[in-house]
Amino acid sequence: METKVILQKQDLTYLKWSHIRSSSGTAGTFLKAESTISGKKVYYKLSNFDQEKGIIGHECVNEIIVDRLLTLLGADHLHYQLIFADIEIDGRIYTTYLCASEDFKERGESKTSLDNYFMANHVQGESAYDFCQRSGFDAYIDTMLAIDYLIQNRDRHGANIEVLRNSRSHSLRIAPYFDHGLSFLFNCTSEDEISSFDVMKDRQCNNFIGSRSCYENLKYIKGKQVFLGKLTTTDRDYLFEDLDSILSPVHMDRIWLMLTERYRVLNENI
C-alpha cells in the first residue's frame, strides 16, 4: 500500500467496527474494521472514540506522520493511508479521518506476538532484550528503541511486535514496524494542552523491551548505528504534507519540536 492522505470524502459506511480497549491505560475505545480489496486484506482503525462525543483523538494522523518519518530514516515499516470518510457506528454516521493498512503477512505465514514467542522459547532468567539478541532480532529491536524514543511511543507492548513464521519454508521473520498511534501528543485534546505539552519529559511507557522509560532504553543502543537515513530541517514539509487542514499549526509545531529535539539527544547519546 502506498502512503497517502485521501482528502476527498469516501463512503465507508459498510465497514463493521469492533471495539478494542486500549492497553495503555488511556480512556476511550479504539475501533477496528477490515475488508478485502483485490484479494488483499485491508485493516482500518479509528482514533480514540467516545460513545457520547464521537471520535475525539488524532492517533490516525500520528500513524501517517510516523510512516513518513520511518521512510526518511530507512526503517522497514507498515505503510498507511489516512482517509477522510463517512463511517457508521451503532446506526450513527460520523465523518472523520481513519487509517488503513494492508496485511503484512505473506502467503503461508502465520503470526504470533513477540511476548508469546518469548514465553515459549526463552531460557530461565533471560531478559526480553537478550532473548531478541539470541534470536537474531537485535538490529530490529535496537532501531525500534530509537524510534520509540523519538516519537515517545507509549504502547510498545509485546503484541505490538509480531513474529511471522512459514512452516512450509521453515522461515522466520519479524514483522515491519507498525502501530504508532499512541505517540507524540496523542492524549492532548485542546490547544492549551498542546501548547503546554513538554516534548522532552520522560513519561512512563508500556514497553515490552527494557524499562518503562524510552530514554533509559537508549543505553541498549550506545555506539550503534540504528538508522540508514537521517532527519533534516528540510523534512518538515514532507512529514506534514496535506495535514494542515487536520492538525493546527501549534500541534504540528510541537510534534516537529519533539522530533528535532529528541533526534538531537538521540545522536548525542549514541
What are these regions (language model features)?
Residues 68-72, 143, 147, 257, ...:
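A broad, structural surface signal
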Residues 57, 135, 249, 253:
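Charge-dense, low-complexity intrinsically disordered segments
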Residues 43, 79-81, 158, 174-177, ...:
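A structural signal for short, well-ordered beta-strand segments and their strand-loop junctions
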Residues 2-112:
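Conserved ATP-binding subdomain of kinase catalytic cores across diverse folds
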Residues 91-95, 100-145, 245, 265-266:
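ATP-dependent phospho-/nucleotidyl transfer catalytic cores
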Residues 124-189:
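Conserved kinase catalytic-core segment
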Residues 167-270:
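C-terminal catalytic region of ATP-dependent kinase domains
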Residues 10-20, 130-146, 188-192, 205-217:
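A short, terminal or domain-edge coil/loop segment
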